[in-house]
A protein has these predicted regions:
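Intrinsically disordered, low-complexity segments enriched in small/polar residues
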Residues: 9-12, 148, 165
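Short, glycine-/small-residue-rich phosphate/pyrophosphate-handling segment
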Residues: 110-162
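N-terminal beta1-alpha1-beta2 submodule of the flavodoxin-like/Rossmannoid cofactor-binding fold
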Residues: 1-108, 158, 172-205
């Protein structure tokens, strides 16, 4: 397979995950893949959006919303971008996956590589549990899980605050969302995109 299609469903309230999945999409392209970037449906009523949410929604207005009944068909790999909510995926992403039962029955994602990108307010705000709990859903779909090995030296840095672990890529947003992804975190996101695409090619042989 020369041009694997990598589906990147994401939810981003304040722009952190959007920034990270765009970097992952760049990595997919660098490895010869075709990134398919789509946001999942919002559940928060528009009347409750604050100015920051409105700003991010405007930034993402050209990104299509994924239809759970169609989005998984024909993809060769998947990178899920989801913020942490109490150590789990956000309700918006849960809502998406809970509507994919038809593809679960058909085995659409069996044997396809999958990875997770997340964000949290603090360094110990549930990043790894969110990644792992999201992976449980991906395992039920039959995916082959892809993490970030320590050959990616960016996750070993000690001279700055940074996300990233063997389980997947992450960023730290700050309590009020004031910290955007660092260059170090974006390198990891791009690297994950490359790695997953390369694995998708190998699995299709």
């Amino acid at each position: 397979m020369n041009n694997p299609k990598i589906f990147i469903p994401f939810y981003s309230m304040y722009g952190h995950i959007f920034t990270m999945v765009k970097a992952a999409a760049e990595g997919v392209k660098e490895a010869g893949g075709e990134p398919i970037l789509k946001q999942v449906a919002e559940l928060i009523p528009e009347a409750d959006w604050d100015d920051n949410i409105k700003k991010v929604k405007e930034m993402m207005k050209d990104i299509p919303v994924a239809d759970p009944r169609k989005a998984l068909k024909g993809v060769d790999g998947i990178i899920v971008g989801v913020p942490t909510r109490y150590g789990n995926m956000s309700a918006q992403m849960r809502n998406f996956w809970d509507q994919t039962g038809g593809d679960w029955v058909k085995g659409t994602l069996i044997g396809k590589p999958a990875a997770v990108i997340t964000s949290s307010a603090t360094q110990h705000g549930g990043q790894e549990t969110t990644i792992i709990s999201t992976m449980i859903t991906l395992l039920h779909h039959g995916c082959v899980l892809v993490g970030l090995p320590y050959s990616f030296k960016e996750q070993m840095t000690l001279d700055e605050i940074t996300g990233g672990s063997p389980y997947g890529v992450s960023t730290i947003a700050g309590g009020m969302g004031e910290r955007m992804p660092s260059n170090n975190e974006l390198k990891m996101a791009k690297g994950l995109g490359r790695r997953l695409t390369e694995i998708a090619k190998k699995l299709s042989q």
